[in-house]
Regions:
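LRR N-terminal entry segment and analogous cap-like coil->beta motifs
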Residues: 5-55
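Canonical leucine-rich repeat
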Residues: 23, 42-45, 62-65, 82-85, ...
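Concave beta-strand-loop units of leucine-rich repeat
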Residues: 31-38, 48, 53-58, 68, ...
Length: 141
């Protein structure tokens, strides 16, 4: 099941991923929840998207993330890398993937869950960061 929320606060539910592909021209989508769907890829994301929930899939890569994105939940996938993160991002949940590195972290980031990956180092952490979870990685002190 796919859940889409528009600026008008109306939530729309779709039973198949194919239906989402028809939505790429909408510019007022603010939330997309496609958790638990065995997806291997995502469509082009709308520029207005603020909240993306795509955990428990089989994603190995991402399309370009929109500049408006504030929350990204992409844990329990097959990701080996993340794209450039938008400056607006405040929450990043990317745990339990195959990440060996993280991109530059945005200055507004407050919460980072990157545990259960293969990280050998972390990028510079922003001063705004309040919660960091990075256990079960290949980090050395």
């Amino acid at each position: 099941m796919i859940i889409i929320k528009f600026n008008d606060d109306i939530t729309h539910t779709y039973n198949s991923f194919e239906e989402i592909l028809k939505l790429e021209n909408y510019n007022d989508i603010i939330l997309m929840n496609c958790n638990n769907n065995n997806l291997s890829n995502l469509p082009k994301l709308p520029k207005s998207l603020k909240f993306l929930y795509c955990s428990y899939n089989k994603l190995s890569s991402f399309p370009k993330l929109p500049n408006s994105l504030k929350h990204l939940y992409c844990y329990h996938n097959d990701l080996s890398s993340l794209p450039k993160l938008p400056k607006s991002l405040k929450l990043l949940y990317c745990h339990n993937n195959y990440l060996s590195s993280l991109p530059e972290l945005p200055n507004l980031l407050k919460i980072l869950y990157c545990n259960g990956n293969y990280l050998s180092s972390l990028p510079e952490l922003p001063n705004s960061l309040k919660h960091l979870y990075c256990y079960h990685n290949d980090l050395s002190s």
